[in-house]
Amino acid sequence: INENCTIKGMLEATQVRGDFVKAVSKPFPKKTGSWGDTETPGGTVTVTIYDDHNFDRQIIIPPIIFSGVAYDDPGSGNNPGGTRYTGYGFEVRKNGVLIASRETKGAIPGSYSAVIDMPSGGGSVTLEFKIFQKGNQGAGNITDCTVIVTKKAASGISIR
């Protein structure tokens, strides 16, 4: 169809060149935590968005939320014990360049979200999301890494 038209029924397409929205999601790697049945997140999730369309796109990263835990240390010897905290660092790199760095201590969560422009013809974009333990004790949580890519367009929407 090379002109405007009105479709007065259902349009079904199993293949569309120039998809409007694509999404991927993956959990972060985890290993056994410092105590019992706890887990500690640690590792990298890498997402590559290929520059394979002739229109501008936006990369949308919904909030990735991460936190450590507070725990009681009974103490021993010269260590009086008390409440201790696990902590985590979180970094995001775009094509190898650090674009965000966060950290959290204890149960107070840290988060990262973004909207990144991807102009057509600008080359592929590789995003690396890295979570790492800070300190000796490991126990914490992180949500899955989700990335949404959409055609950049402002028709039919307004923001003020």
Q: Where does each model-flagged region fall?
A:
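Low-complexity, small-hydrophobic/phenylalanine-enriched stretches
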Residues: I1-P27
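Extracellular jelly-roll beta-sandwich "head" domains, especially the C-terminal globular C1q domain
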Residues: S25-R160
